[in-house]
Design a protein with these regions (language model features):
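Short C-terminal domain-edge/linker segments immediately following a structured domain
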Residues: 44-48, 67-72, 154-159
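PAPS-dependent sulfotransferases, especially Golgi type II membrane carbohydrate sulfotransferases
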Residues: 77-125, 131-217
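Conserved aromatic-histidine-acidic binding/catalytic patches
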Residues: 10-18, 35, 61-64, 96, ...
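A polyampholytic, Gly/Pro-enriched intrinsically disordered region
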Residues: 57-69, 172-180
Length: 217
């Protein structure tokens, strides 16, 4: 029951994508009870752009996609783009993906910067590129905040995900990610080398303007 949940002081986990730009209700409702972990990643990856491009194609066509849609000139668009529909509608699926990544990043940055001074919530921003190389740096901070310690279960999960890694893409094989563009490097590459390789791939299917936008992010 709810009373038992509250009495035992349980931790309620809630995870979703692209949340920071729309997270105000969480901060307003929970305030000092909220532990907000913002995992961010360099968007210069063909996996991320390809994955989001597929969703951009689905939004407006499939009403089961789980996203609130708005109607404009007899067509449906995801609510994220409500203020820039004419611009958004002219883009290819991959360019729409980059458009939304920029929108979420900038709006999310603005919101979180405001919330840090307005609310007493615990906010931890975690760069994915740093997490896979130095996981305990962040795990220990989270564990301390919720009053626990990293144990053998934690270590087992890290091992299953091959963390810490020798390179960014040195992850265990996953068909879902593979089908959307992820490829494990055949040799150990630096973060800069991996990003440059991915940038060249992405440049083959987006405009110069979209690529420059991705560079800025």
């Amino acid at each position: 029951s709810l009373n038992k949940f509250i009495k035992e002081n349980r931790v309620m986990h809630y995870m979703t994508h692209s949340m920071s730009a729309y997270s105000k209700p969480l901060f307003e409702t929970l305030n000092e009870r909220l532990i907000y972990l913002r995992l961010v990643r360099n968007p210069m990856t063909d996996y991320m752009v390809n994955h989001l491009a597929k969703w951009c194609e689905r939004w407006g066509k499939d009403f089961r996609s789980g996203v609130t849609l708005i109607k404009f000139e007899e067509k449906y668009f995801p609510f994220f783009a409500k203020d820039k529909i004419p611009e958004y509608s002219e883009l290819s699926p991959h360019e729409k993906a980059i458009f939304l990544l920029k929108l979420w990043q900038e709006k999310g940055d603005h919101q979180i910067d405001q919330f840090k001074s307005k609310y007493n919530s615990f906010i931890l921003e975690i760069p994915f590129e740093s997490l896979v190389f130095q996981p305990m740096k962040y795990i220990n901070k989270i564990a301390e905040e919720i009053g626990v310690t990293a144990d053998k279960v934690t270590k087992k999960q890290l091992k299953l995900q091959n963390v810490p890694r020798k390179s960014l893409s040195d992850a265990p094989f996953n068909k879902y990610y593979f089908d959307r563009g992820w490829r494990k490097s055949k040799k150990i590459l630096s973060l800069e080398e991996e990003i440059e390789i991915l940038r060249k791939k992405i440049s083959n299917y987006v405009s110069v303007d979209s690529l420059e936008c991705l560079d800025e992010l």
